[in-house]
């Protein structure tokens, strides 16, 4: 893999570099979606989650969720099987074990038909989307993306990712680099688009918040 031509990166606030280094680390846990329903969650956290369940998601958030849902509803029947839900979560950088996936299905499947309809999917993830420590705004994600997209062509290559992570003090092994590209590159074209980057960053941020 050849090293990209050296260019002067666009100056960015130090916080953006810290956020990029943190958010771009591979996700390590999948307890994000179930932690605050467990008995170990504090009463204050549970009260916050209950209040947020009563708040509506914005149209943009619902649209994004519907797009994600449809992309994994392979037979277009308006519901996800356990296998499809597992694939969806893995595409977001989460790594559910079989037991964790079973727990999610049991919690979300309110009509007990063994499938997850869109309304059940929204009910599952809405509290995390509305949590007061929500992940980065689109503007913040765009700034992070621009740090890595060194040639400004709208895509992040493996070389750009490796170079930028090294400059941020997180040099990657070949295995780590390959793994990160594989996690984020959902369409398999060998590079990361802004949409893919946004999903990967959001998933990693949720994982850091709730782990």
Swiss-Prot record:
Binding positions for Ca(2+) 3 per the UniProt entry: 149, 151, 153, 160
Region named Disordered: 1-22, 40-60
Domain of life: Eukaryota
Binding site for Ca(2+) 1: 73, 75, 77, 79, 84
GO MF, any single term: enzyme regulator activity
SUPFAM superfamilies according to UniProt: EF-hand
GO CC list: cytoplasm
Domain EF-hand intervals: 60-95, 96-131, 136-171, 172-207
Repeat in keyword set: yes
Entry-linked InterPro entries: Ca-binding_regulatory, EF-hand-dom_pair, EF_Hand_1_Ca_BS, EF_hand_dom
PROSITE patterns reported in the protein's UniProt record: EF_HAND_1, EF_HAND_2
Binding site for Ca(2+) 4: 185, 187, 189, 191, 196
Gene3D superfamilies: EF-hand
Keyword terms, alphabetized: Calcium, Metal-binding, Repeat
Compositional bias per record (Low complexity), positions renumbered to this chain: 44-53
Coiled coil: none
Amino-acid positions noted as binding Ca(2+) 2 in the UniProt annotation, renumbered to this chain: 109, 111, 113, 120
Function: Potential calcium sensor.
PANTHER family assigned to the protein according to its UniProt record, in alphabetical order: CALCIUM-BINDING PROTEIN 8-RELATED, EF-HAND DOMAIN-CONTAINING PROTEIN
Protein name (record): Probable calcium-binding protein CML11
GN (gene name): CML11
